[in-house]
Amino acid sequence: MAARCTEAVLAALGVLSVCSASSSGSEASGEAEREEPWDGAVFRPPAALGAVGIARGPGSPPPGNREAVDLPVLLWWSPGLFPHFPGDSERIQCAHGACVASRDRRARADPRTRALLFYGTDFRAADAPLPRLAHQSWALLHEESPLNNFLLSHGPGIRLFNLTATFSRHSDYPLPLQWLPGAAYLRRPAPPPRERAEWRRRGYAPLLYLQSHCDVPSDRDRYVRELMRYIPVDSYGKCLQNREPPTVRLQDTATATTEDPELMAFLSRYKFHLALENAICNDYMTEKLWRPMHLGAVPVYRGSPSVRDWMPNNHSVILIDDFESPQKLAEFIDFLDKNDDEYMKYLAYKQPGGITNQFLLDNLEHREWGVNDPMLPNYLNGFECFVCDHELARLNAEKAHASSHGDIPVPEPRIAQSSHMNCPVPTPGFGKVEEIPENDSWKEMWLQDYWQGLYQGEALTAMIHNNETQQRKFWDYVHEIFMKRNKNL
């Protein structure tokens, strides 16, 4: 799969970073190790944390007089992801106090380093820092697709972490609406029906499919291919392409993930957008869902099974899984295409008072981070402060225990739960898995990748419990787990 630098995440959030060359094979792959990885040497404060800038987090008071040398340290472990610029260390002022954020791996050995922050796409069990130090929390940021790291979709993998920020509403710092700027984004007026009727007369299909990332865990192309037998679909991009974009500029696949004005005007011609996520998981919703709604099109959606919880009202999206077959879905879309009054009911949320889902409105109103909002912090810095405040509270609890002569118990460690990701095994986009040939590329790739994630999570958990110090033993652990499982089959 195409590699990309974590810098794309920071750029989307308006945060600067320095990225190194990428060598991973995931969809949003991690960067290569920095040239000076932590080598177990004694921590040297002047080199690692000597030059500390100042940043303030959401709801934070002005900086106090506490010296940076006394503050707990948060270490960003993923190379290339550090939401501060320039330098390697930054004092951050958060709601309950201050911490030092750093990306210098030499800081790991220092007792002041209280948390390691990992970016899920970059996290590799084979390269996890060992031995795991008892006083350090592991914090996970993983807002991207489950396909980037299936280790995190299994209990043993997600429970490696103490704090999480994922697309799941159940995570400690939830990011399910990361692609939705606000309610106003949904209220943008739709094009008049007569405009789209004119495009239909010019030969445009009722349905748009725009994908260039093919062969994904959701197996969406298999479903769309079957749907095309029953209704016209204009397919752009590299997947099932049957029509060329009207301009050279729109042929650039990078443009397809943006809100480029020319692209948006082009997409607005279509009444229905096929919106199939690349992986299936509760609360995993991307621009594939929200952008059609912004443009006044009706999403024909497959992705998050919990998507109804987030819709502006109960009649704004067509769910593929509500139909017993692609043929039945095609018949329903054809009916709406020929009946403007019925079609417009799906756009009622754009009218004053049309957004009736209070759960959606409350989540948009009360989140402390924003999307392209200069008045709010981005979720990277927000999560960083969430971790800082947690570690400050944990330090205070440990001090209270120490001074109580045992009257106050030791604070219990916080452990992530399966619900913080909880992504199921991939299933075929159409048909049954036993009907698919064994040499099918989807079957060969994604089922194996999914279960390999389980073995890797179990292996790393065992290594931590055994206080292993040598990462090179990781694949021996994986092999042993694999052999035991196959022996019991």
Curated annotation (Swiss-Prot):
Where it sits in the cell: the answer is: Endoplasmic reticulum membrane
Q: Does the keyword Nucleus apply?
A: no
Name the organs or tissues of expression: Widely expressed. Expressed at slightly higher level in heart, kidney and lung.
EC primary class: transferase
The membrane topology noted for this protein in its Swiss-Prot or TrEMBL record is: Single-pass type II membrane protein
Spell out the disulfide connections. C385-C388
Q: Which GO terms describe its biological process?
A: N-glycan fucosylation; positive regulation of protein secretion
Q: Does the keyword Ligase apply?
A: no
Query: Could you name the domain of life of the organism this protein comes from?
Result: Eukaryota
Q: Which UniProt keywords apply?
A: Disulfide bond, Endoplasmic reticulum, Glycoprotein, Glycosyltransferase, Membrane, Signal-anchor, Transferase, Transmembrane, Transmembrane helix
Ranges of the Lumenal topological domain: 25-489
Supply the Gene3D superfamilies for this chain: Glycosyl transferase family 10, C-terminal domain
Q: Name the residues that span the membrane.
A: 8-24
In this UniProt entry, which residues form the Cytoplasmic topological domain(s)? 1-7
Of the GO CC terms on this record, one is:
endoplasmic reticulum
Pfam families associated with the record: Glyco_tran_10_N, Glyco_transf_10
Q: Which reaction does it catalyse?
A: L-threonyl-[protein] + GDP-beta-L-fucose = 3-O-(alpha-L-fucosyl)-L-threonyl-[protein] + GDP + H(+); L-seryl-[protein] + GDP-beta-L-fucose = 3-O-(alpha-L-fucosyl)-L-seryl-[protein] + GDP + H(+)
| Glycosylated residues, chain numbering | N162
Q: What does this protein do?
A: Protein O-fucosyltransferase that specifically catalyzes O-fucosylation of serine or threonine residues in EMI domains of target proteins, such as MMRN1, MMRN2 and EMID1. Attaches fucose through an O-glycosidic linkage. O-fucosylation of EMI domain-containing proteins may be required for facilitating protein folding and secretion. Also shows minor alpha-(1,3)-fucosyltransferase activity toward activity toward biantennary N-glycan acceptors. However, this was tested with a library of synthetic substrates and this activity is unsure in vivo.
Q: Which family does it belong to?
A: Belongs to the glycosyltransferase 10 family.
According to UniProt, the name of this protein is GDP-fucose protein O-fucosyltransferase 4
Gene name, please?
Fut11
